[in-house]
Structure formats: C-alpha cells, structure tokens
C-alpha cells in the first residue's frame, strides 16, 4: 500500500508535472493490467481514467457559471460510486479522503490542494482502483458505468441543466445537433424489416427514387431482417460520400430492387410550413445546425409563390425545447435588420457575447406573430424575446419555460460529453428570463374553447385591460429583478402551460388579417419597452 505521505507528495506534484509518471506509463500502456483480469472483472485503465477525470474536472472548474473547487466536485464524484455499490461511502476530513466499504475503512489518502485538478483526478482514479478490490459490483462494472457514476456525482450539486452523457448517448446528441452521414429516410419496423414512412427532401434517398412503403431487406449485402433500430441505423449511417447499396421490396412489384447511393450530411428536419389564406405558418420544432438555413429557404419560397398576397408570418415555437444558441440568433436575424438580439453573461471570458442583428427581414416588414407555451425553452425563448423586445412581433400563448441559461458542451477523451451551464441569457430590454420566461402580450393560459369567437374575446379583453397588461410587462422586464416571490407572482399572471390546440393560431390570424388590430397588440409591448429607457 502507498503511504499517505507518498500520496500527498504525488498529488501535489501533479499540478506541476501533469499526471504522475504519465510519460512512462504511456510507454508501458497500463503495466498493472498486463495480466488478464480475473473472471467477472472488467479491465480498468489508470491512464485513461485519470485523463478523462482531469478533462472533466478542469472543464467544470473553469467554465461552470459559478465557482466550484475541484476538491468539492471530486468528492461528490467519488460519492457517485454509491450508484454502483451502495455500500461504498466516502468522507473528507482533516485533509484526508476516507473510503469505506460497508462501514469498514478501505483506504485513507491525503487530499491534494482544493484547486489541484490533476491531483484530484489522480486521487479519484486511485480511490476507484482500491474500491474495486473491496466491491464485486465495482469490479464487474465497465469503465463507462464508472464514468457515468462519477460524473453524475460531480454534477449532482450543480444546476439541473448540467449533465453527463456517455459515448453512445453523446454520439446521438451530436447527430441531433450537427447532423450525420446517412441517406435521408424515416422508417419503422414492420414484419421484422425497416418499412420506409418518409423520404426527406434533397437527400440521397430522394435522388435514388426510394419511396414510402418500400421495405429494405439488405444493405451492402447484409440482411436487415430481425435487426433492431440501433443495429439498422448503424448499418445505414456512415461517413459522408461513402457508397451504400440497398435491396428493397416495393409494393406492386414481385422482384427485389437494388439501388445505390452515396451517403450525405443529413440534418433532422426542424422546420415545417403551411400557408393559409396568404398567412405563412412555420413550425420550428428545435434548433439544429440547419434550422436557420431551412427557415430562410421556406420564407423565400413563400414570398416567391405568394408575392404581394403574402399577409404575414406565424412562427410557432410551442413545444420547442431549444437547441443551438447561434441558430436562434440567426433565426432572429432573418426577421430583424438592426438592434441587439441577445447577450450572454458568465464567469468564463468566452461565455460573454453580444449578438446584434444585421439581416434583411425575410418577412419584408409584414406582421409577425410568435406562439409560445410552457415547453418553449432556451433557444426558442431567445427568438421570442428578441422579436418582442425589438417590436417586431406579437407574442401569443403562455409564459415560456424560463430556461434562460446557456450550456457549453465539453467533449471528453472517452468520447462522452458534459453539457455544462456557463452563462445566463439577457434579453435586449435587459431582463434575464432564467426562471421567469418570456411573457406573451396576449395570454391564453387556461383558455379551452377553440372557437373563433373565443379568439376575438381574448384579444378584446387584453386590449380593454391595456394598462394592467402593460404594468405586468414593465415589471416583467425590469433589469436585475432577482426577487423570487415577485418573479413567481409575475409568472402567475400568465401561468406556464402546454398548449397544442388551434386557439393561438386563430388569434394570430385575427391579428394578421386586421393590420390596425395587430398594431394595437404590438404596442402593448412596444410601449413598455420604451418605458425602460
């Protein structure tokens, strides 16, 4: 056993020389594990684990929105091992870290200085290696399970939006954000084969002539029958520009068909559109790398097809959980020509940003209405707040979710990732909507009747109570308002709810079809915005 004195010297040295003996250990590639592990045990790499923990601890201590000492998060991370074996407990007292297994002391190690990230990473690894000798559950847990337990512990006392994703989950997250190499289909499993239910536009699948109802039987000669969705997706996806050959059965044909295509960069569809009586209604489901481009394309095509008969735009953000901040900025910029869109403020220098509009308003000055509800969050709230504060849109619905924080993604050496809160969002009028949300000018909370008369009644009631609505909006947009009871009362003025019916869309159409009415509704927030200066 290594003595406490030697351990203390080792962890203190880590801040000066990196991981202890790392250059030598790299050459030997985990010498302690050269012998095969005992039956049931899993291989645990000291070098890899220390590297992963150091990267995670460093990212959290440097970038989290509030200061967090490395020692504090490391202790919480070690406590997280209890998720694998509840008999494992740890305490930190008198400069020592003590590990217990079922109440019995297993080891007592000297703690590094609180800010020594590398030292705490090395200590965490040594605690785990020692704990594996005392815990069958930990011996048989793979490294990913250990990482998950530790980082869940590390993040347990931070905000609810900071979280860890293992390598597999992180891969899926990156596909949602950044797209993936694929062919552009949606499918479900029917009779043990993938049945195509949708072909995405402008994708290899569309170009190759794939159609709804086709059943894929083979991909590059590999039978697909009986495979699960994950296995099928892993076969269909691959590096962009790589070739894939599909064999399929098509309704109405007896012989199998073979088609070949090259994979392309595929983005999940986030934009859908319909046009009713000259009003363009665009639903934005989330914000990924392709959202702003897709929205711009929809708006330009709508303008080309409608010409001067285009009356206005409804941007439906209900149920939109958010996504990429820069995409929300670009979406806002499509409808604004000047002024601030949003600012972000955090502890790390790179988290402080001021985003300004400089677009060309693809709605051409026509009325814009934004629909929000209690599930409109994050990037969706950025768009709603920017268009409302810049007097460009009337916001209709319920108070939004109130996720006014920004997360950065820390990619770890194991290909997992930590999503970490590192800044707060500040609306152009100066208020922070974290825990508060965006307040619609026309509130539909608790309204259940979808009739057209109900839409007119709500508009009439809001406009007749103009002073009350404006007083609420002035209080809502008070910069620096942190009093939780006041913020709660403000949210109660328009309770956050999930809205999926057509009432909000009917109100939007009423406003767009009556320019004078739209202007009166817009002035509800425009006047309160001016009152702040």
Identify the function of each model-found stretch.
Residues 30-162, 471-533:
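Terminal targeting/pro-maturation regions of precursor/exported proteins
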Residues 144, 149-151, 156-198:
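PDZ/PDZ-like peptide-tail recognition elements
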Residues 4-20:
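Bacterial N-terminal signal peptides that target proteins for export
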Residues 17-29:
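Bacterial N-terminal signal peptides
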Residues 177-181, 189-193, 210-211, 238-242, ...:
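Short flexible coil/turn linkers enriched for glycine and charged/polar residues
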Residues 31-34, 41-57, 267-533:
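C-terminal "post-core" interaction segments
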Residues 56-62, 131, 205-228, 314-316:
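Conserved PDZ fold ligand-binding element
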């Amino acid at each position: 056993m290594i003595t406490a004195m030697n351990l203390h010297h080792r962890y203190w040295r880590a801040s000066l020389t990196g991981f202890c003996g790392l250059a030598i250990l790299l050459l030997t590639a985990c010498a302690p594990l050269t012998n095969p592990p005992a039956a049931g045990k899993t291989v645990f790499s000291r070098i890899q684990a220390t590297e992963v923990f150091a990267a995670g601890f460093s990212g959290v201590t440097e970038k989290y929105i509030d200061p967090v000492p490395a020692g504090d998060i490391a202790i919480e991370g070690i406590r997280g091992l209890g998720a694998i074996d509840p008999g494992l407990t740890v305490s930190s007292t008198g400069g020592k870290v003590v590990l217990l297994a079922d109440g019995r002391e297993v080891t007592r190690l000297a703690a590094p200085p609180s800010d020594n990230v590398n030292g705490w990473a090395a200590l965490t690894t040594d605690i785990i290696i020692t704990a594996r000798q005392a815990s069958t559950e930990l011996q048989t847990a793979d490294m990913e399970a250990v990482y998950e337990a530790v980082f869940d512990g590390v993040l347990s006392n931070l905000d609810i939006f900071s979280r860890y994703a293992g390598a597999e989950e992180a891969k899926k997250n990156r596909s949602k954000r950044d797209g993936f190499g694929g062919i552009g289909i949606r499918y479900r499993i029917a009779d043990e084969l993938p049945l195509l239910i949708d072909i995405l536009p402008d994708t290899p699948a569309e170009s190759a002539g794939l159609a709804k109802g086709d059943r894929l039987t083979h991909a590059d000669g590999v039978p697909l029958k009986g495979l699960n969705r994950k296995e099928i997706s892993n076969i269909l996806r691959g590096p962009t520009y790589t070739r894939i050959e599909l064999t399929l059965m098509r309704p109405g044909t007896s012989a199998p068909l073979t088609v070949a295509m090259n994979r392309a960069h595929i983005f999940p569809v986030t934009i859908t559109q319909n046009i009713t009586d000259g009003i363009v209604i665009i639903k934005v489901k989330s914000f990924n790398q392709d959202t702003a481009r897709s929205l711009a394309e929809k708006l330009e095509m709508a303008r080309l097809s409608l010409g001067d008969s285009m009356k206005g735009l409804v941007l439906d953000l209900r149920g939109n959980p958010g996504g990429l901040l820069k995409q929300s900025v670009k979406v806002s910029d499509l409808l604004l020509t000047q002024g601030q869109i949003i600012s972000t403020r955090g502890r790390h220098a790179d988290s402080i940003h001021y985003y300004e509009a400089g677009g060309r308003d693809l709605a051409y000055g026509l009325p814009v209405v934004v629909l929000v509800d209690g599930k409109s969050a994050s990037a969706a709230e950025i768009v709603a707040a920017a268009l409302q504060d810049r007097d460009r849109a009337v916001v209709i619905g319920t108070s939004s979710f109130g996720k006014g924080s920004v997360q950065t993604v820390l990619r770890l050496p194991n290909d997992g990732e930590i999503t970490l809160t590192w800044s707060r969002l500040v609306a152009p009028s100066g208020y922070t909507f974290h825990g508060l949300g965006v307040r619609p000018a026309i509130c539909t909370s608790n309204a259940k009747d979808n009739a057209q008369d109900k839409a007119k009644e709500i508009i009439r009631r809001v406009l007749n109570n103009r002073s009350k609505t404006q007083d609420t909006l002035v209080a809502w947009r008070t910069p620096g308002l942190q009093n939780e009871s006041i913020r709660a009362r403000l949210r109660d003025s328009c309770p956050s709810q999930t809205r999926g019916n057509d009432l909000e869309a009917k109100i939007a159409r009423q406003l767009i079809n009556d320019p004078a009415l739209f202007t009166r509704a817009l002035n509800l927030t425009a006047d309160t915005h001016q009152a702040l200066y």
